[in-house]
Amino acid sequence: LTTSSAASDVYKRQIWWCQGYSEPGSGSDLASLSTKAVEEGDQYIVNGQKVWTSNADKADKIFCLVRTGPQEPKHEGISFLLIDMDQPGVTTRPIKLISGKSPFCETFFDDAKAPQKDLVGGLNKGWTVAKRLLEHERTMISAMGLTGGGDGSEKTKSGLAEIGKKYAGTDSDQKISDKAFRKKVTLHDLNSRAFGLTMQRVGEETKVGSPSPAAAMAKYYGTEHNKLRYELMLEAMGTSALGWEGEGFSMEELAITRDWLRTKANSIEGGTSEVQL
């Protein structure tokens, strides 16, 4: 942000932002991005495309990685630019996901304009800013390993243990009757508790402005752990997890199935699992 008034508007929720990082040809190799910004007078002219832009169709502004030094090494020719979404040169197109939701968008820049004062961190210094933000993003995404939910924002009404008892049955002690499956659920719960303590430490470091190097590992483990949670739910539910819509399935069953489908992207978005290792 370039002014204190802009920061104040964010805190008051008067301005909604989206993030313009990934491009159709630049995902894991983000620094190969090709969206360019050319200086023209006291502004930049932006052309290119971003993809997987969360809530771009609802955002007022986008903080965007753009190439301003085409002759520089790829990491050194990137700038961090703030761009108004409400202008003729910016269009968005929602992407419908397999879960049925459309939180992501394609974002197109066709001679979009941004004032030079909205360049953050200095010309060709955007990669440093972006890396810092990615540390926070990965910490945030990793939290789905604790909360569940296919997109990290919604929880199913019942947890893994409750789903296991409901669909796999219980013994006289009200424990999951299938001992092998019960062991899987118990191990998942123990790992959740251990991961929670780790996330507390990472969170404390983040609060003081020092994102931990553990953010990458937390993102890796949290997303893989969340995917496993839903795999175990479906293992317990059996054919009850095969519904998409219509009669014969409860709302919770349909929600779990859709969330399970959504979790397949957890280990891709925000940096693939392979990139974190």
Where do the language-model regions lie?
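Glycine-rich beta->alpha junctions and the first turn(s) of the following alpha-helix
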Residues: 90-197, 266
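Single conserved hydrophobic/aromatic residue that forms the stacking wall/gate
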Residues: 1-7, 11
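Glycine-rich phosphate/pyrophosphate-binding beta-alpha loops
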Residues: 26, 51-56, 98-99, 265-270
